[in-house]
UniProtKB/Swiss-Prot annotation:
The gene is rpsO. It holds the Pfam family Ribosomal_S15. Residues 8-25 have a biased composition (Polar residues). SMART domains: Ribosomal_S15 (SM01387). Gene3D superfamilies: 6.10.250.3130, S15/NS1, RNA-binding. One of its GO terms (biological process) is translation. One of the primary rRNA binding proteins, it binds directly to 16S rRNA where it helps nucleate assembly of the platform of the 30S subunit by binding and bridging several RNA helices of the 16S rRNA. Forms an intersubunit bridge (bridge B4) with the 23S rRNA of the 50S subunit in the ribosome. InterPro entries: Ribosomal_uS15, Ribosomal_uS15_bac-type, uS15_NS1_RNA-bd_sf. The lineage of its organism: Bacteria, Bacillati, Cyanobacteriota, Cyanophyceae, Synechococcales. Part of the 30S ribosomal subunit. Forms a bridge to the 50S subunit in the 70S ribosome, contacting the 23S rRNA. It comes from Synechococcus sp. (strain CC9605). Keywords: Ribonucleoprotein, Ribosomal protein, RNA-binding, rRNA-binding. This is Small ribosomal subunit protein uS15. GO terms for cellular component: cytosolic small ribosomal subunit.
């Protein structure tokens, strides 16, 4: 369920706002979204894995808080991130 270094670096390069950006809200949301997608696929096959389900809900909450923060700071960055990741319909 975790991301290896090449996948993580690829996500960072795709979503970074400047050359040395590794921890902006956009990058964090992108990494959380990828982990959420992987864990969701895992839970479809392993229905009774309740501890992973709890971790999934925590990640969803963290992503929701980050998106709320982004929306309060810059509506345009929020909209761009949502569109790029394809979340929230």
């Amino acid at each position: 369920m975790s991301l290896d270094t090449t996948e993580k670096q690829q996500l960072i390069n795709t979503h970074q706002t400047h050359g040395t950006d590794t921890g902006s809200a956009e990058v964090q949301v992108a990494m959380l979204s990828e982990r959420i997608n992987r864990l969701s696929r895992h839970l479809q096959n392993n229905i009774h894995d309740f501890s992973s389900r709890q971790g999934l809900l925590k990640m969803i909450g963290r992503r929701k808080r980050l998106l709320s923060y982004m929306r309060s700071k810059s509506e345009q960055r929020y909209a761009d991130t949502i569109a790029k990741l394809g979340i929230r319909g």
